[in-house]
Each structure stands twice: as C-alpha cells, then as structure tokens.
C-alpha cells in the first residue's frame, strides 16, 4: 500500500533523511529521485563509488536505506540482513516475488528498470554486428548460462540493437526530466 512504502521510508530513525546510491548519475540515483519526488519526500542523496560501499554503510547504519539492484542486494536479502521495500521495475522480480513494485505500492506509472547492454563502436560493419547479436542471443538463451545468471541475481533477456535503441529513445526524456529536477550533473 502507499502508506506502508512511504511510512517505511519516512519513519527511519535517522534525523536527517538521506539515501545511498551506487553513484552520481546512476540508475540507482535516478530511481531514487523519481520515487522521492513522486512521494513528496525531501531526501538527501549520498553517492557511493559502487554498490559494495553503499551496502556496507547500510548494514553499518550510516545510511537508513539505499536504492540498488536486485543482484547487488540479493545476498543480504537472502541472509535477512536487509528488507526489500519495493522494486522499481514494471513487474515483480522473479527473484523477489513477494516484494511489490512501486506501482503496486501506490505509485502508478513509476517504473525504472536496470538493464545491461553490449555496446560496440559506431560504424561497426553490419556483418559483424549481426554475428555479435546472434551470438549474444544464443548465449542468453543457453539454459546453463541463464541458470548461472539467475543464481547471481540477474533476470536474463535478449533485445536486438533496434529494440535497445527504441528503449533508449523512450527512456531518455524521462532521465533528462529527472536530472533537471534533481540537479543531477555529469561532474
């Protein structure tokens, strides 16, 4: 419910609200800023140089919460050291099926997936690009590879370069708006 997610965050024992991310300008910061703006919360961003230092400070009580990837948080979640409040993806994570999405928590339309992409230089010959795409599709569909990826917290999927370009074109305006509103710069 809306109240529980907001209450979980706003009832932190820390007098000054802050949250950790795995770095300035990362999807971790963007997802946090997107949510806190929608929730009407003023939360100070504490950027870390990666997930590990942010998680260390979360576990040590230096920050009250963090926005991180499922794969980075999964070991601590499995050990019961931290609690997942919500996932930012459009659907529940197969790895955390009991954890609601932000939309299910009362924030419809809030969605931000973290994804990884294989990239190559501009001007890559079409034949090389086609071979790379085919190889990547085969690797991602290989059951053994998929099992290994799932075991470390990934939800593997494949998208062609065309689909990836469409995704980037769709997400870029949202990211620009969040960056402008939260004064996120490339410093």
Place the predicted regions along the sequence by residue.
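Conserved, function-defining micro-sites of small-solute handling proteins
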Residues: 1-187
């Amino acid at each position: 419910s809306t109240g529980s997610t907001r209450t979980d965050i706003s009832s932190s024992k820390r007098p000054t609200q802050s949250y950790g991310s795995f770095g300035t300008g990362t999807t971790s910061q963007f997802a946090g800023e997107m949510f806190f703006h929608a929730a009407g919360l003023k939360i100070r961003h504490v950027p870390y140089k990666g997930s590990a230092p942010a998680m260390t400070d979360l576990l040590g009580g230096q920050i009250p919460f963090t926005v991180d990837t499922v794969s980075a948080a999964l070991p601590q979640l499995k050990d019961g050291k931290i609690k997942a409040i919500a996932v930012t993806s459009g659907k529940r994570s197969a790895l955390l099926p009991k954890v609601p999405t932000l939309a299910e928590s009362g924030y419809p339309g809030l969605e931000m997936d973290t994804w990884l992409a294989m990239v190559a230089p501009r001007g890559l010959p079409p034949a090389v690009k086609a071979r790379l795409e085919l190889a990547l599709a085969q690797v991602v569909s290989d059951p053994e590879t998929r099992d290994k990826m799932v075991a470390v917290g990934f939800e593997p999927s494949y998208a062609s370069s065309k689909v990836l370009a469409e995704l980037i074109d769709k997400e870029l305006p949202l990211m620009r708006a969040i960056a402008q509103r939260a004064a996120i710069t490339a410093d």
